[in-house]
A protein has these predicted regions:
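Short, small-residue-biased leader/transition segments that mark boundaries at the very start
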Residues: 1-8
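Anion (oxyanion) recognition and catalysis
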Residues: 2, 17, 80
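Short glycine-rich anion-binding loops that position phosphate/pyrophosphate groups of nucleotides
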Residues: 9, 29-32
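Divalent metal-coordination and catalytic microenvironments
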Residues: 12, 79, 120
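Glycine-rich phosphate-binding loop signature in dinucleotide/nucleotide-binding domains
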Residues: 15-21
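Catalytic subdomain that performs nucleotidyl-dependent activation
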Residues: 23-24, 31-105
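A short, charged, Gly/Pro-tolerant segment at domain boundaries
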Residues: 97, 115-130
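C-terminal helical/coil "lid" or tail adjacent to the Rossmann-like core of SAM-dependent
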Residues: 99-114, 120
Length: 130
């Protein structure tokens, strides 16, 4: 599962249970899932990705990712059309993380990166059975 840090996810889940909120929605999109897939292949040797729904702590918390099927560019287009301000990424590691390295690697493919991202996520979904 992909979370910024173990400690922050534990805090998020503990707080959600304390507030009697048993579903937590993350804003991961299809491009996040594709990068996670490639990271798992490169650094863990596994064909795995983010799942749309995952249950933690014997059902106490369910994480959902309602945007997981949408490419980032579609979400950006919608947000701008709706008048939402641009938001910078909030990863504490920023540009020095493995995720940033994999993003930079994919950008090297230029106009082909969109199809590569789509193929990565589709392959992982099929391998994981969803």
């Amino acid at each position: 599962h992909s979370f910024p840090t173990r400690r922050s996810s534990d805090l998020l889940f503990t707080t959600s249970v304390d507030l009697d909120c048993h579903k937590v929605a993350f804003g991961h999109h299809a491009d996040d899932a594709a990068v996670t897939t490639l990271m798992n292949l490169m650094f863990n040797g596994k064909l795995e990705t983010m799942v749309p729904r995952v249950v933690f702590f014997d059902g106490a918390v369910t994480v959902i990712r309602p945007l997981i099927t949408l490419p980032e560019k579609e979400l950006i287009r919608y947000a701008r059309a709706a008048g939402y301000p641009d938001q910078p990424a909030s990863c504490p590691q920023g540009e020095t993380s493995r995720r940033a390295e994999v993003e930079a690697f994919l950008r090297q493919f230029g106009c082909r990166q969109e199809q590569i991202r789509t193929n990565l996520w589709r392959a992982a979904r099929e391998a994981m059975g969803f």
